[in-house]
Amino acid sequence: MIRLIVLGHSSDDKGTQLESLTASILSSLKYTDIIMNVVGKGGNELDVVAKYSTPHISGDLIHPVVCECKAYKSKVDITDWPKFLGKFYTARLEDSKAMGIMIALSGANGNVVGAYDGILKKNVPISLVSGDDLLKSLASVFKMPPYDIIRKKVSYYTDDHIHS
């Protein structure tokens, strides 16, 4: 697995860049009405919101989507997870078709992954995206070559070990 990093002047700058990358991924997947930095009801700060349409016999079903983007150097821990769930379930109270996505640049710790796995077993429309899944999405959006090709090109210029 490649470790993805976002370079920026501050943690806010890095977060904004990850939000922009998330918006680009959603746009490439045909999500619509993508807006960054929305303050929802009750003062909930939502990093990215969008809508996703699925065909239905009586017309398209529109699913609101709330995204939380974490550009931390370390893995997302259990203190961030309930905050995201609160935002997600608030959106579900407004529209039962709402979906939630947490983008975790450096992944999530075992407690978060365990909690996420438990929620998935209940068929809740929520996603935790990090690591290879995030890289694949970005590679698709930005037409990046596969990791092996990047590694070969870099090794042409240096003998230093490439950490993955």
Where on the chain are the PLM-derived regions?
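Mixed-charge (Asp/Glu-Lys/Arg
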Residues: 1-164
